[in-house]
Curated annotation (Swiss-Prot):
Keyword Calcium: no
Annotated source species: Laribacter hongkongensis (strain HLHK9)
Keywords tagged on the record: Ribonucleoprotein, Ribosomal protein, RNA-binding, rRNA-binding
Any one Gene Ontology molecular-function term assigned to this protein's record: rRNA binding
Gene name of the encoded protein: rpsO
Gene3D superfamilies: 6.10.250.3130, S15/NS1, RNA-binding
A Gene Ontology biological process term: translation
Free-text function comment from the UniProt entry: One of the primary rRNA binding proteins, it binds directly to 16S rRNA where it helps nucleate assembly of the platform of the 30S subunit by binding and bridging several RNA helices of the 16S rRNA. Forms an intersubunit bridge (bridge B4) with the 23S rRNA of the 50S subunit in the ribosome.
Protein name: Small ribosomal subunit protein uS15
Length: 89
């Protein structure tokens, strides 16, 4: 269920602003998106797993808050990130 260390390191490398950057909103949103996408098939197979669904909803909410922050502080980076992650249609 959890994303592998290698995948996490690759995501951090792809979205970091500078070398060693793991805390920027772009990196955090990309990691949350990977975890959310990893959990989605689980809920298609296990529709009654409400305990894990709550965790998923918390992750979605946290990602939404980070995206709102990024949009408020750096709109250009926000647009680039949602395009790159494919979050908006």
């Amino acid at each position: 269920m959890a994303i592998s260390t290698e995948l996490k390191a690759e995501i951090v490398k792809d979205y970091q602003r500078a070398e060693g950057d793991t805390g920027s909103p772009e990196v955090q949103v990309a990691l949350l998106t990977a975890r959310i996408n990893d959990l989605t098939p689980h809920f298609k197979a296990n529709t009654k797993d409400h305990h894990s669904r709550r965790g998923l909803l918390k992750m979605v909410s946290r990602r939404r808050k980070l995206l709102d922050y990024l949009k408020r502080t750096d709109a250009e980076a926000y647009r680039a990130l949602i395009t790159r992650l494919g979050l908006r249609k």
